[in-house]
């Protein structure tokens, strides 16, 4: 599971997920990519589930890049605990995703195989994504 090795602060404020992805919006490593259409949170478990689905489908034929990293800690209080007494402990890590962000990239496989693999990954993600091909300028 992906998570930071160490952070300056253990807990973060909730914040807001606004705007469009300007950085990381172009395919820069592989030939094909999976791009977010909606905004949302992507947990480390969801990233791992999508990666496994793609890797199993391409049978280790091509190469996959994960372009997102879960660097935001999400805290939760235990069940049946009254409010107050401080912020809860860190339960999991998320990556905040804006529309236009490239999540995964792939190369070394045919377009059909890449589309099938990305379709399997799509089912593991909590928001709409689209398949994109690298454009050569």
Curated annotation (Swiss-Prot):
GO terms (BP aspect): translation
GO molecular function annotations of the record: rRNA binding; structural constituent of ribosome; tRNA binding
Pfam families attached to this UniProt entry: Ribosomal_L16
UniProt keyword RNA-binding present: yes
Keywords: Ribonucleoprotein, Ribosomal protein, RNA-binding, rRNA-binding, tRNA-binding
InterPro entries (UniProt xref): Ribosomal_uL16, Ribosomal_uL16_bact-type, Ribosomal_uL16_CS, Ribosomal_uL16_dom, Ribosomal_uL16_sf
Gene3D superfamilies tied to this protein: Ribosomal protein L10e/L16 (3.90.1170.10)
Keyword Protease: no
A GO cellular component entry from the record: cytosolic large ribosomal subunit
Record note on quaternary structure: Part of the 50S ribosomal subunit.
Family statement drawn from the similarity comment of this UniProt entry: Belongs to the universal ribosomal protein uL16 family.
UniProt function note: Binds 23S rRNA and is also seen to make contacts with the A and possibly P site tRNAs.
Descriptive protein name: Large ribosomal subunit protein uL16
UniProt source species: Legionella pneumophila subsp. pneumophila (strain Philadelphia 1 / ATCC 33152 / DSM 7513)
């Amino acid at each position: 599971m992906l998570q930071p090795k160490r952070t300056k602060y253990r807990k973060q404020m909730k914040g807001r997920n606004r705007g469009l992805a300007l950085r990381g919006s172009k395919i820069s490593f592989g030939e094909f990519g999976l791009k977010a259409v909606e905004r949302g949170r992507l947990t480390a478990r969801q990233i791992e589930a999508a990666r496994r689905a793609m890797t199993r489908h391409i049978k280790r034929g091509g190469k996959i890049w994960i372009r997102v990293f879960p660097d935001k800690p999400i805290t939760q209080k235990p069940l049946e605990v009254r409010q107050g007494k401080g912020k809860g402990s860190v339960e999991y890590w998320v990556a905040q995703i804006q529309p236009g962000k490239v999540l995964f990239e792939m190369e070394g496989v045919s377009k059909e195989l890449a589309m099938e693999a990305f379709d399997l990954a799509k089912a593991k993600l909590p928001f709409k994504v689209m398949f994109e091909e690298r454009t050569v300028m």
